[in-house]
């Protein structure tokens, strides 16, 4: 895509250029978009502990930034960035850094070399001051090129367990950030809370490598009005609301289970169901059509919901359904356990029944919330039992019929929230720029 021209400040000096790099899943894209918003806010304030004097102090920087999103050729991130932001986007060749088939591996290495060359040329032309990577194959060629061009980098690990690309890039990056301290044992690094890391970073201490920032989410999650969010979906005050979501690509096993359970669930609740764009809406609509009309009205089906709220309605209230509005409106969620649950569910204090997708380390994300009393977990295999004796129905029924337990889970979830995570990552980018300028 064609890049937009870098805007200039009134004094004639261009803002610093930041690259936000990531792709493959929404869990890699949404954190980058949240950091873009923080950079655009010109250094929102937050408080860190003064480890020397035992006092708290406000940290604020007001560097002006201009951001470019860098994704992979043919990746899902291009459409997602276009829908959710106004950021310019540039696509680079990228591929997996491993493969079982020797021929595929050779092709991937050629693609990696092409991507690294393209990234190096783009760096020379665009001159980024710092680069944030949030995961995905596209980070590899960008970070290799950045290393050659001496551009400072931060790699951010959204999930508890890092993928191969992040484990490799953690060795190249100037700083590594993570959502939760549990990631440290997988990266072979000692995690340091952001508040404790700041004084050491300011003194050019290079021994601090892994910094716990939390998972960055849009600030609207912390400020959205629950009553307004429920109104935009037309929800009743007399029934609890279940949010069903499978992540940025949907979740067929969850969708099929919910379709089978609709006759049992809808007499007890309203459902907001974000099913994804893989065609599952067809069988879900068929399942709802055979139910009585009064139950059909309790089912709100969407293939996709934009993340950012539209507040163009009267009195600044949400005027259209959005994912943020759905999260705030719900009393309980049923969802996968991609990286976003580590930030979004705590931000709104939403208890959840988590059904991790197998094979991609979602179990560890789920376990993080389950062990802290903010969620319960059912296996993907258990979703096949779509009777009222099945694990999914029993978990939903128990939690929606026990407001006290839901409230306790909500409080424990909110205790895990990191409202300043995006600002912290923005602060790390600025710290690297200052380091380079004063080196």
UniProtKB/Swiss-Prot annotation:
InterPro entries documented for this protein: GlcNAc_MurG, Glyco_trans_28_C, GlycoTrans_28_N
Binding site for UDP-N-acetyl-alpha-D-glucosamine: 25-27, 218, 248, 362
Principal EC category: transferase
Biological process per Gene Ontology, one example term: cell division
Entry annotated with the keyword Cell division: yes
Keyword list, A-Z: Cell cycle, Cell division, Cell membrane, Cell shape, Cell wall biogenesis/degradation, Glycosyltransferase, Membrane, Peptidoglycan synthesis, Transferase
Catalytic activity, as annotated: di-trans,octa-cis-undecaprenyl diphospho-N-acetyl-alpha-D-muramoyl-L-alanyl-D-glutamyl-meso-2,6-diaminopimeloyl-D-alanyl-D-alanine + UDP-N-acetyl-alpha-D-glucosamine = di-trans,octa-cis-undecaprenyl diphospho-[N-acetyl-alpha-D-glucosaminyl-(1->4)]-N-acetyl-alpha-D-muramoyl-L-alanyl-D-glutamyl-meso-2,6-diaminopimeloyl-D-alanyl-D-alanine + UDP + H(+)
Pathway the protein takes part in: Cell wall biogenesis; peptidoglycan biosynthesis
The name this protein goes by in its record: UDP-N-acetylglucosamine--N-acetylmuramyl-(pentapeptide) pyrophosphoryl-undecaprenol N-acetylglucosamine transferase
Naturally occurring in which organism (per UniProt): Roseiflexus sp. (strain RS-1)
Gene assigned in the entry: murG
């Amino acid at each position: 895509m064609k890049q937009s021209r870098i805007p200039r400040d009134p004094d004639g000096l261009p803002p610093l250029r930041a690259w936000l790099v990531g792709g493959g899943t929404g869990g890699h894209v949404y954190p980058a978009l949240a950091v873009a918003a923080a950079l655009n806010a010109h250094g929102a304030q937050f408080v860190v502990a003064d480890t020397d004097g035992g006092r708290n102090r406000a940290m604020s920087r007001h560097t002006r930034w201009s951001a470019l999103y860098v994704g992979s050729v043919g990746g899902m991130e291009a459409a997602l960035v276009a829908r959710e932001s106004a950021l310019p986007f540039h696509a680079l060749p990228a591929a997996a850094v491993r493969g079982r088939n020797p021929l595929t591996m050779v092709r991937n290495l050629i693609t990696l070399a092409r991507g690294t060359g393209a990234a190096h040329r783009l760096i020379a032309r665009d001159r980024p001051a710092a680069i944030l990577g949030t995961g995905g194959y596209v980070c590899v060629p960008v970070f290799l090129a950045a290393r050659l061009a001496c551009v400072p980098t931060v790699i951010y690990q959204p999930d508890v367990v890092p993928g191969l690309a992040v484990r490799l890039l953690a060795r190249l990056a100037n700083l590594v950030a993570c959502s939760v301290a549990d990631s440290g044992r997988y990266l072979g690094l000692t995690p340091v809370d952001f508040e404790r890391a700041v004084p050491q970073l300011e003194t050019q201490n290079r021994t601090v490598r892994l910094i716990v920032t939390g998972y960055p989410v849009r600030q609207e999650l912390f400020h959205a009005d629950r009553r307004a969010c429920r109104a935009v979906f037309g929800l009743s005050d007399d029934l609890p609301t279940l949010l069903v979501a499978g992540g940025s690509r949907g979740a067929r096993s969850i969708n099929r289970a919910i379709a089978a359970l609709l006759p049992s669930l809808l007499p007890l609740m309203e459902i907001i169901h974000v099913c994804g764009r893989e065609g599952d809406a067809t069988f879900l609509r068929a399942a709802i059509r055979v139910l009585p009309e009064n139950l059909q009205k309790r089912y709100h089906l969407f293939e996709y919901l934009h993340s950012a709220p539209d507040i163009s309605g009267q009195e600044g209230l949400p005027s259209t359904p959005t994912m943020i509005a759905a999260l705030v409106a719900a009393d309980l969620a049923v969802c996968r356990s991609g990286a976003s649950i580590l930030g979004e569910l705590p931000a709104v204090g939403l208890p959840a029944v988590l059904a991790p997708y197998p094979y991609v380390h979602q179990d560890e994300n789920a376990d993080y919330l389950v062990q802290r009393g903010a969620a319960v977990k059912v296996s993907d295999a258990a979703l096949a039992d779509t009777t009222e004796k099945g694990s999914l129905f029993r978990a939903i029924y128990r939690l929606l019929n026990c407001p006290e337990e839901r409230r306790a889970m909500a409080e424990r979830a909110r205790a895990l929230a990191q409202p300043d995570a995006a600002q912290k990552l923005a602060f790390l980018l600025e710290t690297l720029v200052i380091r380079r300028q004063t080196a």
